[in-house]
Structures are given as C-alpha cells and as structure tokens.
C-alpha cells in the first residue's frame, strides 16, 4: 500500500440498508485491500455508568459517538499504522474489553448513521454515500434486528423509535443527505447503484496507482 487509502463513507438512517450496501461493496474487493469500519464501534465508553443510566443514553444523537477516537484511528490508517478498533456490547450498552486489530488497507469503508454529520469526518472521505429508504421499511427492519440480535422487546423498540429514533433522524440524519455525493434509494436492493460505486472505486484506485 504505497498511496493514500481511499475512504468511502456510507451513511443513512437506521434500517436504511446502509450496512448491506457497505458489505456489498466490501465483497467486491480482495479482503487484503479493503476494510470495513462501523461507526457503531465508536459509541462512547459508558463503563462508569450503571446499566440503568446507560439505558437512558440517546444513541441516535451525535454526542453518543466518540468521533475524536474514530478520526484519530482514520489518521493512523492513512499514515500506514494499524489500529485497535473498539468492540461495542449492545446488551451491556458500553464498550467491551475486546479490541480488533485493523491493518491499513487501500480502501476504507466507513458505515454509520451519523458519518456525514461531522465535518471532520466528511473532509476525510473521497466518496460520500447516503442510503435513502422509506421510513416504514426502516422501522420494520430495526424492529427485527433489535429483537433478534440485541435482546430487545417489541415494546421497547417501538417506544425508542417514536420518542428518540424518528426525532433524531429528522433533526440530525436526514439533513446530512445534502452532503452526499451520491444518494442510493432502496438500500442494498439497488444493484445498479452498488455496481456503479464499485466501478468508480476501482477507477480511483487505478488512478492513484499511476500517480
């Protein structure tokens, strides 16, 4: 890896399909040349709080994320240095004691709801994507995910969506759509958009290789 890595930001509301889009792009490249980093891994450490206090945290607000650490890690990767990516425990609502060693790669894919909200992160991205999906579809996907994967009850998911997730989406996430270079409708179902992005990324890689 001789040239500066390419950073692709994939943002969008919860349940929009942004994770699917990010993974579909990821799978089109050799694993030795690409890495996927989730913004969720950079939720702030809340180990000093009780579980009851952690449950009151607004996880859809920009202040829930430790973007300072994420930016520090991105600069390290850009400079050819490995990082120790934190691992977030969704059931305990704080960071676990584990970390994942991430080596620098030619392509870095960032994925998260509020990636485009922080100007410092936007400035590091070569391509900014926003995955745009109907709100009804997003809430259904969130319900299924949180109940199956994160040990939540249906009642708690609905309450969180109406009181926190939807208001935060309208206030903080939806406005970041204007920063996107490309808006992808229908999330991971949009094969045309995903294939176009892969082609564009390959072109950027080839362009950097001859500079």
Curated annotation (Swiss-Prot):
So, what pathway does this thing act in?
Pyrimidine metabolism; CTP biosynthesis via salvage pathway; CTP from cytidine: step 1/3; Pyrimidine metabolism; UMP biosynthesis via salvage pathway; UMP from uridine: step 1/1
Taken from the UniProt entry, a GO cellular component term is: cytoplasm
What SMART domains does the annotation carry?
A: AAA (SM00382)
Q: Which first-to-last residue range defines the signal peptide?
A: none
Q: Which biological process terms from the Gene Ontology are attached to this UniProt entry?
A: CTP salvage; UMP salvage
GO MF, any single term:
cytidine kinase activity
**Residues engaged in binding ATP:** 12-19
Q: Which EC number(s) does UniProt give? A: 2.7.1.48
For the keyword Lipoprotein, the answer is no
Coiled-coil positions are none
Q: Which domain of life is it from?
A: Bacteria
- UniProt xrefs under Pfam families: PRK
**Which family does the record assign?**
Belongs to the uridine kinase family.
Name the chain's protein. Answer: Uridine kinase
Gene that this sequence comes from: udk
């Amino acid at each position: 890896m001789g040239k500066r890595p390419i950073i692709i930001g994939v943002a969008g509301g919860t349940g929009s399909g942004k994770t699917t889009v990010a993974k579909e792009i990821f799978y089109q490249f050799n694993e030795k040349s690409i890495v996927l980093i989730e913004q969720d891994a950079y939720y702030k450490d809340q180990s000093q709080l009780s579980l009851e206090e952690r449950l009151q945290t607004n996880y859809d607000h920009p202040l829930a994320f430790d973007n300072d650490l994420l930016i520090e890690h991105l600069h390290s990767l850009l400079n050819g240095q490995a990082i120790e990516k934190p691992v977030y425990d969704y059931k305990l609502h704080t960071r676990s004691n584990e970390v994942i060693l991430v080596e620098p790669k030619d392509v870095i894919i960032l994925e998260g709801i509020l990636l485009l909200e922080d100007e410092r992160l936007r400035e590091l991205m070569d391509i900014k994507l926003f995955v745009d999906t109907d709100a009804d579809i997003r809430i259904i996907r969130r319900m299924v995910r949180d109940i199956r994967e994160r040990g939540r009850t249906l009642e708690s998911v609905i309450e969180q969506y109406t009181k926190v997730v939807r208001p935060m989406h309208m206030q903080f996430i939806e406005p970041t759509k204007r920063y996107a270079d490309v808006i992808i409708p229908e999330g991971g179902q949009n094969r045309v958009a995903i294939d176009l992005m892969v082609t564009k990324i390959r072109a950027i890689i080839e362009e950097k290789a001859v500079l």
